[in-house]
């Protein structure tokens, strides 16, 4: 039974129609990422409507902190996924198995480190972000509970990354749907029925994340594929760990430092008070949904490129990059239309106060047209990662999202006493990053990358 299920889920992306392979692989990723976002979005909707705007601002303001720490681990997981996809494309089953084992041990160790570190640095990070006094206590409460259960998030993302690397994007989707439903039910139960406030939404998120982790690990344990987890044979292959770190560390540094830079962006937002913070929080939740199509296609292009590079199908990998970009642009444009039409109504879902709706709508109208720039960055940076080059995206993104954006924000904050120039810091960084990453993709030497990997 397990064998039949596993064969129907894994996908060999070295054969068949390119656009169909990318589309069929991307759709479950889009749906899965959608339900992933429902975790924090449910939290925001519930606290915004049943607790208050301060609680909504608290949930929104801690996002960059969570992403900065989790982003480091996710970067290392990217390294593991690239290596697994290349070995899978090359039909090197023993290497696939040992890479999965090494990744699991690495995840266990890092989950302990991140749990302790996250709880310890919470108050310092919140003060560094200039979090207002009417928000800081609830922000700290939410963060500490979240980090107490961060292992569930890590093991789910590790497991789903392994499944994506071999072409299975459906199992992670099924588990996310289940856990998102559980999260929603528990949010309402803990907050509305039990009156637990922000502690309730944080606890609901942690429970749901652990459920998705358990289900993912179960699939990896029971499959008959080369990526099966054999608990009695778990070991750390130091040579493979070195490869994972070499490929994943640049992505890890990039994601973590970029997220840290977003902490500083949040600090500029916080200066304008809780109304602007709540409006920005609502915008950021909607922004995460808008990013889903391009992020999903980008992830698909990583797996597609990795498998085809592993099989030495370079021309097919290049065609896949162009197809993925066009697909991401098309879906993003289609999603932008209803967003611009119903912007006030979308913000209303998070909070009904007039000032919050006004600021949230302003951010949506101001920034949404620039989403078409992000498709360039999301697709071509992931293509380079799939080919084994994670350093170039790291350098480009750090230069664009950290150095350039922080200089821009510093200058604008001293010239203008307005939130609009601050908000435009995001698309300004997108533009610089997209131009640079596409130029690097055009100059990428595929044959050299193959020999290196």
What are these regions (language model features)?
Residues 41-44, 116, 158-162, 184-189, ...:
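Alpha-helical transmembrane segments of multipass membrane proteins
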Residues 56-116, 153-172, 266, 279-343, ...:
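Small-residue-rich hydrophobic transmembrane alpha-helices
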Residues 15, 19-38, 42, 65-72, ...:
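Residue-level signal for short hydrophobic patches within transmembrane helices
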């Amino acid at each position: 039974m397990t064998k039949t299920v596993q064969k129907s889920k894994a996908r060999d992306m070295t054969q068949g129609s390119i656009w169909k392979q990318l589309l069929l692989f991307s759709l479950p990723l889009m749906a899965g990422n959608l339900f992933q976002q429902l975790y924090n979005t449910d939290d925001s909707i519930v606290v915004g409507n049943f607790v208050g705007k301060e609680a909504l601002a608290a949930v929104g303001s801690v996002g960059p902190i969570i992403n900065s720490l989790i982003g480091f681990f996710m970067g290392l997981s990217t390294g593991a996924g690239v290596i697994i996809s290349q070995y899978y494309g090359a039909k090197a089953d023993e290497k696939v198995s040992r890479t999965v084992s090494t990744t699991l041990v690495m995840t266990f160790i890092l989950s302990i480190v991140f749990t302790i570190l996250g709880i310890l640095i919470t108050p310092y990070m919140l003060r560094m972000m200039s979090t207002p006094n009417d928000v800081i206590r609830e922000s700290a409460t939410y963060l500490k509970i979240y980090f107490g259960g961060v292992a569930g998030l890590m093991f789910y993302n590790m497991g789903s990354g392994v499944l994506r690397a071999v072409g299975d994007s459906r199992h992670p989707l099924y588990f996310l749907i289940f856990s998102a439903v559980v999260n929603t039910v528990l949010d309402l139960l803990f907050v509305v029925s039990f009156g637990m406030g922000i502690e309730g939404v944080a606890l609901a998120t942690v429970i749901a994340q652990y459920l998705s982790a358990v289900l993912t690990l179960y699939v990896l344990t029971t499959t008959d594929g080369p990526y099966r987890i054999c608990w009695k044979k778990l070991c750390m292959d130091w040579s493979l760990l070195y490869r994972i770190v070499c490929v994943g560390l640049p992505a890890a540094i990039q994601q973590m430092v970029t997220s840290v830079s977003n902490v500083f962006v949040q600090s500029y937002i916080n200066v304008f008070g809780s109304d602007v913070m709540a409006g920005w929080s609502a915008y950021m939740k909607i922004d995460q949904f808008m990013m889903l199509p391009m992020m999903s296609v980008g992830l698909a292009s990583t797996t597609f490129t990795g498998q085809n590079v592993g099989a030495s199908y370079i021309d097919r990998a290049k065609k896949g990059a162009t197809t993925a970009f066009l697909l991401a642009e098309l879906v993003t444009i289609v999603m932008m239309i209803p967003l611009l039409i119903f912007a006030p109504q979308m913000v209303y879902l998070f909070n009904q106060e007039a000032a919050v709706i006004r600021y949230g709508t302003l951010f949506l109208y101001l920034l949404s047209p620039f989403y078409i720039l992000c498709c360039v960055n999301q697709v071509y940076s992931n293509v380079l990662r799939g080919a084994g080059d994670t350093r170039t995206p790291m350098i480009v993104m750090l230069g664009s999202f950290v150095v350039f954006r922080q200089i821009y924000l510093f200058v604008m904050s001293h010239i203008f006493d307005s939130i609009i120039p601050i908000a435009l810091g995001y698309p300004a960084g997108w533009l610089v990053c997209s131009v640079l990453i596409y130029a690097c993709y055009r100059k990428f030497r595929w044959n050299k990358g193959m020999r290196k990997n």
